[in-house]
A protein has these predicted regions:
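N-terminal active-site segment of His-dependent metallophosphoesterases
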Residues: 1-81
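Extended active-site neighborhood of metal-dependent phosphoesterases/phosphodiesterases
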Residues: 84-150
Length: 150
């Protein structure tokens, strides 16, 4: 039997500042998240992009067949963060059996993120469901199969 190598990642919290995000977007719980990021967590995630690049090299070196990311690409779920995360994660999306993802709570941080569909716009291609009859809310939960079935 062949071995399938799976790389699972989560909680990369990529951000590159908040260019183009209106100040009014922070007059809610994002201001608390921004303060937490600025005063406590920013150093933890300071090299997140470089770590994702290293993960891509590791994935290729180890021959990962499938890459799964279970969310929290972002810190505050803004559209620029999600777009930036999609750009940085790109090298991981080419595994032979594919790349599969679901958003984390930080990716859907506030109602504006969900209503605007920012995560779906940037990552929707990786969340398709292959068994739609089991979905209960549109395409949720996304169900994917990989490899062979008995």
């Amino acid at each position: 039997m062949a071995v399938t190598k799976v790389l699972h990642i989560s909680d990369v919290h990529l951000e590159d500042g908040f260019p183009g995000v209106p100040l009014k977007s922070f007059i809610n719980k994002r201001i608390v998240g921004l303060a937490n990021l600025h005063f406590r967590r920013r150093t933890v995630f300071a090299e997140a992009a470089q770590k994702v690049e290293a993960l891509a090299a590791f994935s290729k070196e180890q021959g990962a067949d499938l890459v799964i990311c279970t969310g929290d690409y972002t810190a505050l779920g803004t559209e620029p963060e999600i777009a930036y995360a999609r750009k940085i994660i790109e090298p991981l999306t080419h595994a032979p059996l594919g790349f599969f993802t679901v958003p984390g709570n930080h990716d859907l941080y506030l109602r504006d993120t969900v209503e605007a569909g920012w995560f779906d716009q940037h990552f929707g291609a990786f969340m398709r469901t292959e068994i739609p009859e089991h979905a209960v809310d549109g395409v949720w939960p996304p169900i994917r199969g990989s490899g062979s079935s008995p």
